[in-house]
């Protein structure tokens, strides 16, 4: 059962998050991801993302992240402290799939909404429960205006934990 009384609703500017564009043919990127990450990327569409991770040869998690498909682009949304780990590992496989990786200069906004709130067309569902859901939105033009319904980064992290997600910290990688 979800401890819903502790969930806080609103939006957060995820300043410590990086968006990485995996550039290539749709199927090439899909095949790359299917072979390297822990989620089923065939379930991803314009509004539904996946929480995923990348493991080393021993099966230990190197980093975790979200995968979304935004405006015909495969994006990896990852903590900035872990982006180099992801890039160092995935770069080994890029030439085999004719895919490149590019760090984008986009703002990433996280939303925690109750079930009655409508998801906007530019949002990507990443976590869902009976009471609430979490989405990500890419603000490539830096147009999002902060308002009174802003969440702290700590509230966003707590919401993720309440909903069953564990974010790997840099010191936990590969353990």
Regions found by a protein language model. Name each.
Residues 1-175:
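Basic, glycine/lysine-rich polyanion-binding surfaces/domains
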């Amino acid at each position: 059962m979800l401890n819903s009384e502790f969930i806080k609703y609103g939006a957060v500017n995820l300043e410590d998050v990086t968006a990485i564009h995996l550039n290539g043919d749709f199927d090439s990127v899909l095949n790359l991801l299917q072979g390297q990450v822990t989620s089923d990327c065939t379930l991803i569409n314009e509004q539904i993302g996946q929480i995923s991770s990348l493991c080393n040869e021993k099966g230990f998690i190197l980093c975790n992240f979200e995968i979304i498909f935004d405006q015909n682009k495969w994006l990896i949304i990852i903590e900035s402290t872990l982006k180099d780990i992801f890039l160092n590992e995935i770069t080994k496989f890029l030439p085999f799939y004719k895919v490149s990786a590019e760090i984008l200069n986009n703002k990433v906004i996280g939303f925690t909404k109750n079930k009655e709130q409508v998801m906007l067309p530019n949002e990507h569902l990443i976590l869902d429960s009976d009471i609430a859901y979490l989405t990500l939105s890419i603000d490539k033009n830096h147009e999002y205006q902060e308002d009174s319904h802003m969440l702290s980064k700590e509230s966003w992290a707590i919401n993720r934990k309440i909903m069953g997600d564990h974010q790997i910290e840099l010191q936990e990688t590969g353990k």
